[in-house]
Amino acid sequence: PMVSCGNALIVSPDAGGVPRARSLAKDLSLDIAIIDKRRDKANESDAMNVIGKVEGKQCIIVDDLVDTGGTLIKGAEALLKEGAEEVRAYITHGVLSNGGMERINSSSMGGLTITDSIPQYDHQKVKVLSVSKLFAEAIRRVHHDESISVLF
């Protein structure tokens, strides 16, 4: 299921992802929130602080990579704790190592959408979108000295 844009909010999972989230939010005319991860003391777990108003919103986390899913899930939990209606993530590369798929499936997240840039399969809460045609067209255009900018 997709989210309703009227009630949606784009979320950057960290400070480094703000430009990506801001660009998407601008394209979709949506607001943005940021998850600020802080470690208070050595050997303590990270604290997730939400910057922005997420109460009653369908939060869309956007990022380039998810590995084990631990940080993503902690971020989603922080958003829900702040009153988010639902949290979904759209991430380009889904490594999902060391039990990441199971971790996502048992989490409080509404779902995760990834591409098949790393081979994965649809699962309970995980949807995989194919980028094979996009990659094939980019390769064809490069081979024929054509612009690839129209693809992105």
Question: Model regions: which residues?
Answer:
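PRPP-associated nucleotide enzymes
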Residues: P1-F152
